[in-house]
């Protein structure tokens, strides 16, 4: 296995990623920091009862994706595809050790309650959403099973273009997010930009039809871009896709003009919160649902039938007492 491109690895480390194994990575979420420092919660706390200081944001493949979405603010991924089969237990334990390393500086901060910081050392939620397309990790099912056995929820975010992988998962995530960012094939090809597979929209469509059969919580997430996918006609087309998928929830989240996406989109593509709410109020009745909540700081609205907290599994396995903390890493320095 060749491993991660060194130039990309250097960029990610500069952005405070802790690289785990050949392709995995962990990064402290903005809202984890906000929870520790100012007792603020992200929208997952308001919508699903997720405590931000207990959430670990990671990906088994931070450098691998089969799409090149215009709205993605992450660094561009590798141009070649290299599937990873890292041992799930190693990935989980090293990710937790990395999370502890990333949070270590908060332990001595007088603004951070000591008990809360100690509680954060053992995550209760794993957001498999940091970067890349996690369904490219060949042992994803085993990894999520281990998370559940350690008393942690899993929140998997996928672009939905690999339906066979999702269909064959022996262990499903606690909550499965599918990015539904285009209402039709034309917008999909323009916005999501498949790298290799010309049938990506067809595969994505297969995933939508698969979702109703999956015994887990399903979320369809629409990333809203003004002037691109928010017209009244787009809303009708999105609603048709949502009715096929029949998710528990629909999240309407506004695009943010940050990171690499600034090379593809403009600040004018950022919808206001009022525009996000207008979209949500229009799509809700078309899907037989209602607007349940919203979060202005996170630029998102929730559509569904009712809010139910995400269930945390009872642990049957425990981290070793001597698991410890990942060592500090000397970042790569690449020539300009």
Regions found by a protein language model. Give the residues of each.
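Short Gly/Ser/Thr- and Asp/Glu-enriched loop/turn motifs at secondary-structure junctions
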Residues: 53, 121-123, 295-299
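Flexible, acidic/Gly-rich N-terminal and inter-domain linker regions that tether
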Residues: 1-71, 75-80, 84-101, 304
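Short Fe-S-cluster ligation motifs
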Residues: 90-120
């Amino acid at each position: 296995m060749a491993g991660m491109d060194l130039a990309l690895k250097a960029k990610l480390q500069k952005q405070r990623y802790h690289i785990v194994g050949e392709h995995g990575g962990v990064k402290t979420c903005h809202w984890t920091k906000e929870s520790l420092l100012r007792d603020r919660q992200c929208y997952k706390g308001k919508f699903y009862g997720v405590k931000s200081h207990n959430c670990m944001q990671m990906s088994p493949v931070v450098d691998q994706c089969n799409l090149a979405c215009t709205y993605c603010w992450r660094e561009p991924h590798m141009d070649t595809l290299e599937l990873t089969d890292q041992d799930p237990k190693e990935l989980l334990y090293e990710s937790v050790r990395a999370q502890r390393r990333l949070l270590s500086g908060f332990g001595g901060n007088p603004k951070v309650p000591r008990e809360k910081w100690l509680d954060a050392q053992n995550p209760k939620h794993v957001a498999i959403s940091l970067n890349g397309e996690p369904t490219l990790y060949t042992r994803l099912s085993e990894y999520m099973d281990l998370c559940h056995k350690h008393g942690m929820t899993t929140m998997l975010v996928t672009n939905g273009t690999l339906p066979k992988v999702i269909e064959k998962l022996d262990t499903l995530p606690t909550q499965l997010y599918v990015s539904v960012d285009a209402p039709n094939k034309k917008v999909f090809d323009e916005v999501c930009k498949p790298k290799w597979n010309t049938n990506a929209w067809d595969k994505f469509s297969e995933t939508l039809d698969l979702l109703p059969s999956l015994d887990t919580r399903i979320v369809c997430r629409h990333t809203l871009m003004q002037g691109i996918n928010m017209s009244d006609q787009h809303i009708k087309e999105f609603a048709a896709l949502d009715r096929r998928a029949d998710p528990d929830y629909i999240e309407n989240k506004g695009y943010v003009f940050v990171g690499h996406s600034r090379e593809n989109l403009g600040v004018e593509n950022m919808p206001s919160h009022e525009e996000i709410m207008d979209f949500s109020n229009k799509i809700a009745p078309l899907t037989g649902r209602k607007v349940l909540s919203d979060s202005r700081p996170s630029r998102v609205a929730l559509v569904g039938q009712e809010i139910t907290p995400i269930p945390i599994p009872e642990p049957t396995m425990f981290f070793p007492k001597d698991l410890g903390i990942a060592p500090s890493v000397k970042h790569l320095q690449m020539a300009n």
